[in-house]
Amino acid sequence: MPFDVQFLKVFDGVLMLFERAKAVFPGGVNSPARALKHLPTPLVAKAASGPYLYTDRGRLVDFCLAFGAIILGHAHPKVRRAVEEQLARGWIYALLTEEEVLFAEKIRAHVPSVEKMRFVNSGTEATMNAVRLARGFTGRDYIIKFDGNFHGSHDYVLVKAGSGAATWGIPTSAGIPSDVVKMTVVVPYNDVDAFVKAVREVGDRLAAVIVEPIAGNYGLILPEVEFLKALREETERVGALLIFDEVITGFRVGLGGAQGLYGVVPDLTTLGKVIGGGFPIGVFGGKSFIMDLVAPQGPVYNAGTFNAHPVSIAAGLAVLEELEGGQVYSVANDAARRMAEGIRDLAERVGFDVVVKHIASMFQFYFKKGDVKTPQDVRESNEKLYLKLHELAIGHGVYLAPSQFEVNFTSAAHTAEVVEEALGALEKVFRELRREVGGNS
C-alpha cells in the first residue's frame, strides 16, 4: 500500500479517536499540554521503550520524557521488575510499609535539608501542602512567587505576573476567588532588587517564598546564584520560610538536586517526577521542627488514601538505586550537552538566530537574538517558529518539548547513537524550516 494512502488511513483513525475523546474529555485530553493545538490532532501513544515513543505518527525519539518524569528511559527493566514484584504482594494497603521508610531514608541521605517528609501523589499536592505548612508554621499569610515559575494547579499559586515590579493577587484561572490569591505576590525571576523591594513591602506578613531554583516550566531559565542567595538571606531576615520547588530538578540535575548544585539550602523542598519512575508521586519535606507540625503530630492537616502508594514507592526505590550507581547522570548529561551543541550548530549553519540553554540533562532553545535570562526573554522569542519546527520534527521521527515554554530532557537511554540519530533528523528539519519561512528568525 502506498505511504500516502496508509498515512490517510492512520490519520482518519486518529481523527475518529480524537472526536471520541472530545466527547468525553474537555478539549479531548486530560491535561492541557497534551492537546498540541498546533497539530491537526494530539499524538496518540501506543507504547514506549528506552528513548522511544511509539505513536500514531510512528517511532519518535522522545525528548519530552513525560515532562521530565523519566530519567532511566521508558519501561526500564529494573523499574518494571520492581513494580511487578510489588504487584505480586498487593498494590494498596493504606498502612505503613518498610519500603516507604527505606525510600525516605535514601532521599534524606542525598538531600540533607529534607530531614522529615510526607509522601503525596503529585507535585501539585506537594507544593500546596508546603505552602500550607509554611503558613501554619509562621502564623503568617502572604507568599511570594516568581513570574514564569509554575508550582502546580492549586489556587495558592495560579497567580498572574503583571507589568510592574510586583503583582498582588490576580488569578490566572477562572474559578479562583480573588480573596484566595490576594496574599500571593508575584515578582520577576532573577531580579534581586525587585525581590528585596517586595519583601520589604510585605514585611512581617510574609510566610514563605516559593521558587523553582532552576526555572523549568517557562522554558529553561538558569538562576543567577546571587538571586538564590538573596532569597535565602531575605527570608531569614524576616523570619519567613524558603521553599524550593524541585519537582523537576530533584534527582534530575544530580542526587542533591539544585540546592546541592548551587549550595543554597531551603527550609522546605518539594519533589516529584523523577523519584516516581513514571508513577504518581510527590514529596514535601524539610527541617524536622517544621515538619513536626504536620498531622498527626501537629495541627497542619494532610492525609491521603494513596499517599506513599506501594507501587510508586517500589518504582522510586528502583530509580534511586540506579541513580546511585553513577552511570545514569554521565550518559543523560552528555546527551543533553551534545543535543544543545548540535542544535546551536545546526541553526547557525542554516541561518537561524537561536539561544540554547542547557544544564545537566535538560535543554531548550529559542528563536531569538541575545540571551534568555528571564521569562520576558522567553515571551519575546519566536514561538510560531518553534511550533513549526516541532511539527516538522515529528514528521522526521523526533518528539521535542511541545512548546518553547516547556523543557527538553534526556535519559540514560539517550546514547550517543540515539543523539546522532536525532541530530541527523533535526538537520533535515532545520533545512526544511529554512525553506518554508526563509530568512533569520
UniProtKB/Swiss-Prot annotation:
The keyword Isomerase belongs to this UniProt entry's keyword annotation: yes
Keyword check for Isomerase: yes
EC number(s) reported in the record: 5.4.3.8
CDD domains documented for this protein: OAT_like (cd00610)
GO molecular function: glutamate-1-semialdehyde 2,1-aminomutase activity; pyridoxal phosphate binding; transaminase activity
PTM sites of type N6-(pyridoxal phosphate)lysine: 273
Protein name: Glutamate-1-semialdehyde 2,1-aminomutase
